[in-house]
Amino acid sequence: MPTAMLPSSPLNRQQGFTLLELLISSLIFAIMAIMAYGGLDNVLSNSKASQQALNRLQQIQQSITIISRDFSQLVPRSVRDEYGNIQPALSTANDVDNLVEFTRGGRANPANLLRSTLVRVAYQFDDEKLVRLQWPQLDNAPGAEAKKTTLIDNLESVSIRFLDDNAQWQEEWPPVNTGASISNTISPPPLAIEVVLNLTDWGEIRRLYAMD
């Protein structure tokens, strides 16, 4: 008796994947992997950019704090240079490399050492950087070197000007038209000092410090 042929079931016909299905699955997986990698790369890039922006903000804030502390504690104490010559308490002409040089108070002394609370500082604009200088003592001995600290980089320009007792802004101090040259007892300290920083990324930062 002939054996009847049973039709194959749909289950038997669908065991496994065709080559086309495998190719499509691989393509979808590759696209998803690329999208996932791109998303991760964007996250990492954004995180790095955010950290750089935060570091820059902290640098600017710390620098402004130091500048403000220096100028707000300016004192009328003239000094002697390494040659014994008297220099003004505040001057823009002591050194061609310095924007300004002055005496300030408030030097910390947590160990109660036998030293003055006054210190001599200066600011330089060098290679797109604002550099702060501080000398170990007020009256410099021959060969005395200042400690240099870079405060801000990526600077386009720095300008400092001084408000005299006639309410006129001066680019130099002591003002050249007063004839004063050696001490702030002859040329009184300015009424105010303006500092303008032009940053390549943040633009202009302007600070005005009133002198007591």
Each language-model region and where it sits:
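Extracytoplasmic beta-strand-rich oligomerization domains located immediately C-terminal to a leader/signal peptide
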Residues: 35-141
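Edge beta-strands of extracellular beta-sandwich domains
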Residues: 206-210
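Short, exposed beta-strand-loop hairpins at the edges of beta-sheets
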Residues: 194-200
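N-terminal single-pass transmembrane signal-anchor helix
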Residues: 2, 11-40
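Intrinsically disordered, low-complexity regions enriched in Pro/Ser/Thr/Gly and acidic residues
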Residues: 103-188
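Short acidic/polar inter-strand loop motif in beta-rich domains
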Residues: 202-204
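Short, Lys/Arg-enriched, disordered terminal segments
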Residues: 1-14, 53, 212
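Extracellular Ig-like/FN3 beta-sandwich strand-entry sites
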Residues: 190-192
